[in-house]
């Protein structure tokens, strides 16, 4: 899909080669998102349409996971032309079912892709726990609590990514805030004697980024289909991007980074990074992001979904089709979602619009999820699930690269959603920070 540009009197916006349906909802401010008022903007109906939002379904949370839900088997290899569901199904026949509880502040869920069927759950204070056969193993996979600063809400052990060849390399990467308030991207190796234990002494720090404040520190890590490691960093915090990091190409803050961890001393720069030779820091792949807490790649198409936490009014989901050139500018802090926020952008600036936004009447902190590519519920194929930390709402979005895109509110869970995850079979999970639980989407019995 070739992006096209939409121009108003002084700005150029980039969007997909189609109209972009956006859900625009009435707003009220919730404290977690920040402090300030986003001004309004009138958007052309030929460019932006406003679909009706169906009433959400209240998700029923039974006390145990039904035995009818088997342990997942690995997902088939990706295809270039995946089969997607034609429309979002009626959510009333589904619920988020508890898999395990007893976690302490879970913030990330990952699988190792090694055929073991395990899930790895990050606890904010600095531990990685293993979920195997729907049971939480008593001994942590990794415990680095002594290295992690988790005193503040948005700091701690924040992200995990396994090397694409983890089954043979045993390498994995974490994103955490250390005791000096610095973002650390570190590499570890699994223990040579126990696949359920990492070797703490194997830590090698590959990147440090100084954080000016204790919020908007990002946290997400993911390997792309190109084999490179993508790192999401927020604007560094306080509120309203006081240091104007969003548009500053001489800082790694407020950026999506992309590095090659298989070459170089600690890493090398992919040659097609937009500033690999000049114009900005070479690690930068995209910029203008306020706090890309969670992002993920569609395993079948390679498309990238970025959930960017807003300031006071709008939460957004950004979409980057596979093959899109690097160097996109997502607009912060000139724009919050699709709405002017502060300062006057230079003439002829190109921004990439979100494909979905919701107002603070529906939540206050977006938690990005995954595209469903499992086999047990084919009716959800191709659906991107994401939610909100404050409201517990869960949305679904299908066909983002096509003219018949649909997005709607599916569930009101009451959970404090920090993250989503998928197992090796592509089945989807979410974490409830408040209850210390991991839940899985399944049909009601």
Where are these regions (language model features)?
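Short, low-complexity, disordered segments immediately C-terminal to signal peptides
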Residues: 36-65
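Conserved blade-ending motifs and adjacent loop-strand segments that build the rim/top face
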Residues: 404-424
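Acidic/polar, solvent-exposed loop segments in beta-strand-rich repeat domains
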Residues: 239-251, 268, 325
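Surface-exposed loop and turn segments in beta-propeller and other repeat-based domains
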Residues: 139-153, 201-218, 262-285, 330-362
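C-terminal motif of bacterial Sec signal peptides marking the signal peptidase cleavage site
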Residues: 32-34
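N-terminal secretory signal peptides that target proteins for export/translocation
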Residues: 1-16
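Beta-propeller blade signature
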Residues: 185-193, 245-261, 320-321
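Acidic, Gly/Ser/Thr-rich repeat motifs that build Ca2+-stabilized beta-propeller blades
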Residues: 38-41, 66, 70, 74-240, ...
């Amino acid at each position: 899909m070739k992006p096209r540009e939409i121009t108003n009197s002084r700005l150029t916006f980039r969007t997909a080669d189609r109209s972009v349906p956006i859900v625009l909802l009435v707003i009220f401010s919730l404290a977690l998102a920040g402090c300030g008022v986003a001004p309004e903007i009138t958007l052309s109906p030929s460019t932006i349409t406003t679909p009706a939002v169906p009433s959400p379904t209240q998700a029923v949370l039974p006390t145990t996971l039904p035995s009818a839900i088997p342990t997942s088997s690995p997902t088939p290899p990706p295809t270039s032309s995946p089969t997607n569901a034609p429309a979002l199904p009626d959510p009333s026949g589904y619920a988020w079912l508890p898999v395990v509880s007893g976690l302490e502040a879970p913030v990330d869920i990952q699988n190792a892709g090694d055929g073991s069927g395990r899930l790895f759950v990050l606890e904010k204070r600095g531990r990685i726990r293993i979920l195997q056969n729907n049971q939480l193993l008593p001994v942590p996979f990794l415990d680095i609590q002594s290295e992690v600063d988790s005193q503040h809400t948005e700091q701690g052990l924040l992200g995990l990514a396994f090397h694409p060849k983890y089954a043979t390399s045993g390498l994995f990467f974490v994103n955490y805030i250390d005791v000096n308030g610095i973002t650390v991207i570190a590499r570890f190796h699994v223990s040579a004697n126990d696949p359920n234990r990492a070797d703490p002494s194997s830590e090698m720090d590959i990147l440090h980024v100084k954080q000016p404040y204790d919020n908007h520190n990002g946290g997400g890590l993911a390997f792309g289909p190109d084999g490179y490691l993508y790192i999401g960093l927020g604007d560094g915090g306080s509120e309203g991007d006081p240091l104007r990091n969003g548009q500053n190409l001489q800082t790694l803050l407020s950026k999506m980074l992309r590095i090659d961890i298989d070459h170089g001393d600690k890493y090398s720069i992919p040659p097609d990074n937009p500033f690999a030779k000049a114009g900005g820091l070479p690690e930068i792949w995209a910029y203008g992001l306020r706090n890309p807490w969670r992002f993920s790649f569609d395993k079948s198409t390679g498309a990238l979904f970025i959930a960017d936490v807003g300031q006071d009014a709008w939460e957004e989901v950004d979409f980057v089709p596979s093959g899109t050139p690097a160097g996109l500018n997502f607009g912060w802090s000139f724009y919050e979602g699709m709405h002017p926020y502060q300062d006057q952008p230079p003439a002829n600036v190109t921004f990439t619009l979100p494909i979905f936004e919701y107002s603070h009447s529906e939540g206050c902190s977006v938690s990005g999820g995954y595209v469903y590519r499992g086999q047990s519920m084919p009716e959800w194929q191709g659906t991107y699930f994401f939610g909100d930390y404050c409201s517990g709402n869960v949305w679904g979005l299908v066909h983002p690269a096509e003219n018949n895109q649909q997005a709607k509110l599916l569930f009101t869970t009451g959970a404090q959603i920090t993250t989503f995850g998928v197992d090796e079979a592509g089945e989807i999970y979410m974490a409830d920070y408040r209850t210390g639980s991991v839940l899985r989407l399944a049909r009601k019995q």
